[in-house]
Amino acid sequence: MKFNFCLVFFPCPCYFSTVVYYVNEQCTMLKYALPLYPVVDAIDESWSYEHLDKLTKYNEFTDTQLLYSNDDVRDFNNTSRVPMPHQVLVANYTTPKSPVEGVLVVHGVGTGKTMTAILAMLNNINVPGGLKRGLVLTPNRAVLSAFRDELHAYYKSRFSDRHVNEFEMEKYLSETFAFNTITSFANTIDRTADVVLHKEWNATFVVIDEAHDLTMQGVDYPKINGFLKLLTSRKILLLTATPMRNNISDLVPLHNLLMRNRTHDITVEQFNRDMVVRINDVNDVYTVEKPNEYFRRKFAGLVSYLPSNGRDALDVNIVQVGRTGVYGLKYTHVVEHDMSDDMAMVYRTVDDATRNDRDVALLRQRQVSRFVFPDGTYGTTGYQSWMDSKTGRPKRKLLDALRGGASDRAAILDNVAKYSPRYAWIARNVIEAAERGEKSMVYDDLVTGSGLLVFAAVLEALGLERGTGKGAGSFLCLTREVMTVNAIVSAIKNIQQRQQLRRFRGRYRVRFASHRRSITLKDVIHEHVVAHRNDAETEQIIGRGIRYKSHANTIANWKSSTRPNVFIYRHATVDSRSPNTRTVDILMLATSERKRLNINSAISALSSVALTCNGCNPSSQTPPVPPAYRGYYKGVDVSDDNTIPLDPPRITNSFIVKLDEEFDFRRQNVTVKVDSLLKLFNLDPSSVEALKMLFVIMNTIQTHGQLDVDKYIDCNGQYVTISKCVDEFRQRPTFVYPYLVRNTSVYGVGVYRDALAESVITPNMMRDIERSVTTFPYPIDKLPVMVLQGLLETAIVTKGVRDPYNTLGDMVQYYAYGDNDPDVEAAVWLALAAGEGQDYRILTTVGEDGVRRDRYWINCPNRYVDRVVRMKSEREAQINDMVRSKRLKYYGTKNPTTGDFCIRTVPDGSPTNRRCVLTGRKCVTWTSSKLREIGSGVGVRVAANSPRKATCSAIEQEFGRLDALFAYVSCGVQAKRK
């Protein structure tokens, strides 16, 4: 029987369904023809609860094996490589066919985030239609090396039979996966044109490890954010165990990195105004922040959440040692150490001498609370007198003083307690543990002169040997002050060996990020940590020694039926002589608790709308529990009508066959006309149905990396790349390209960004085009102000702008052509960045006489001046408040174009402060004595004869570590005299 049929389209805000009508009027869905997945809301790139409910009924969410791998059977037969359910979940959601383009992976320390990213990349790149390569960005070289080694090891163990020999496999890996540090890659972005970046990196699977390092104030964040938005075809994984460290607003840059369009980015100001509710506590000590419903909607479907204690992967019991409910602390277990008389006297002296300078007082009190040298000095002064600055080892006189003429351990420890009761207690604990064959890890902040190396001196005074960790009576001190990265990596390999388990191994690490984030220690039974201002930092440190399968050797030697214990000690030095006074350690723990209350509320909100692996149990002998969607709202009851199974071929193969009838996609440069493309599907190119079909076709082409080469399509006589047609057609009703704007919304102008970027960088060219164009207006003055701001920011931070100050001056007329808040805010941003006051113009349609006419440019109206000045002051005040909260007197700014580093003074209202003419100047123009003072205030040791350039470099690094370094285009640019 011959059937006649026609193709009918039903428009839908989330996807297009295709229905075939047969002669017998029976209607059946075309299986394997078009994707029926829901998609994100185009208005703000967030998922509706209804769409999440639908999405979580599909195979990606419920299957416990990788959906698009032919090697699952072989892989699952090897129990050491069985992916855990939460890893499978993320890998399946980021396949080429999945509508999920980016995920913030908030999985706790020790849950295997590295392997999650590896599986996700392999489950995409190795799949037909997948992306062409992977890019892994890490915070430092040590993490980079560990990530690369793990990926190579996994790939070789699983796919070695795909390659002829080892050389070919290494070549494939080096060509397919790129590794770089975040800062290094950001610098590459800064000096590379957008068109080159797009050509090289489009269709890339991007993984950013420790993504929380990209802060709004950081220099690297705007570069990485801009780079990701250049890519028309990509998947993004942001890995972090601690997305929030100080405030809930730490989530803002992580949200923005996942957005495809700049118009959907949010600012910290918008976040604090619209997405959280603030409630002051009864004592008005701190502000309670609770996420609202808008917060949940913005992050819905963008997060995969799994807490460290949410997995049953730990084959050990975690025991928190110490008391709770002391000194006003509610939840924290504290191991208290009472100051000796000598230490208490010095501590009170510091408090009295620095009472008017609280930030200096806290720094010095932290030094005193750790160790006071025999002559009553502490910090840098004592360190220089009693320690060898080059080797980090104690001088003979310090060892003699610590021993106090005694020879037995107990007497020496009693003597050490006079200088540091904390170090004496920890030393006794780790030695006794070592004698039982138990490993210990001690983490101490690098508090100048009183930190890790001084504690190592205490162990040497007790007769232990500081070495590489091989000797039975030795200990290992991991610190960048005296060891290279290679030496640290080599030492860790020694201490991880199983045969070394019964030997003594002290574990000591400094607060250098490159090692805190890259070191993993196995079979640690005792973990000693210091007080921090946030629990996130403590959690990361503890996680270095407690991870999935980290205690396999301990369990193998365990003789009991119960699980072994791992003990956590949070140390705090207190003063029993002043029971009503909280020491610096207690203050830090209290601050940490307060921050944790707000962070917990945000985590709860995130988990309620996350793609969460609920009930994952990788260590259990029972089958893994499928993931579950823990929705804050269940939304509508959407039935599982996904008629497109995820394993058979769907649109890709059938569509490519039709394309090959018209032209060969295997050639590097090809062209196809819209008319002929639509006729392949028997559609009239001028019909509405054809436009709807073209939407689906173009969207499919763009999301398949293997098709993303130099392909061109004829859009009304303009030959442009397919991806540009796709971007344009997604938001606009016509294919007119590139300059005529009709029916363009705020969210539809993204297609013009690359067309205008060069013009923005060269303003004179843009003005020439405006004067020469007569047939239709050049669209630059019609674009929404948020798009203009994005274009300008792109131009400013690229090397194409030789003088950002003059560029801003030339482009100032394109800001703020209305009287609404976004327009004025854009003008304020421009004035703040340029270091100017009110030197800008506004495009208006109302003259001074109140008569409406065509748009024309006028100078800033007087009614705007006060408002702009106020908003600019508020913007500067926000930065100052942020720095004051860190108890700093100064902060750094860096010009993203020139690389100049400047220092600004935090205003405090004093006459001296107001007269500070140096504030905001380049660091190298400050006096050497002033630089030494600034360095001392942030813990940087500056020698008297140190060159100013070297001093500035050290201060810049410390400001960056303290999140007190901000991008500022006026840094190094001489502002005009008023």
Curated annotation (Swiss-Prot):
Species classification: Viruses, Varidnaviria, Bamfordvirae, Nucleocytoviricota, Megaviricetes
Catalytic activity reported: ATP + H2O = ADP + phosphate + H(+)
Residues reported to bind ATP: 107-114
Enzyme Commission number(s): 3.6.4.13
Protein name: Putative ATP-dependent RNA helicase
InterPro entries (UniProt xref): DEAD/DEAH_box_helicase_dom (IPR011545), Helicase_ATP-bd (IPR014001), P-loop_NTPase (IPR027417)
Keyword Hydrolase listed: yes
Pfam families recorded: DEAD
Disulphide-bonded residues: none
Species assigned in the record: Spodoptera frugiperda ascovirus 1a
Keyword Oxidoreductase: no
Keywords, sorted A to Z: ATP-binding, Helicase, Hydrolase, Nucleotide-binding
Homology family: Belongs to the DEAD box helicase family. DEAH subfamily.
GO molecular function: ATP binding; ATP hydrolysis activity; nucleic acid binding; RNA helicase activity
Motif window: DEAH box: 209-212
Domain Helicase ATP-binding positions: 94-261
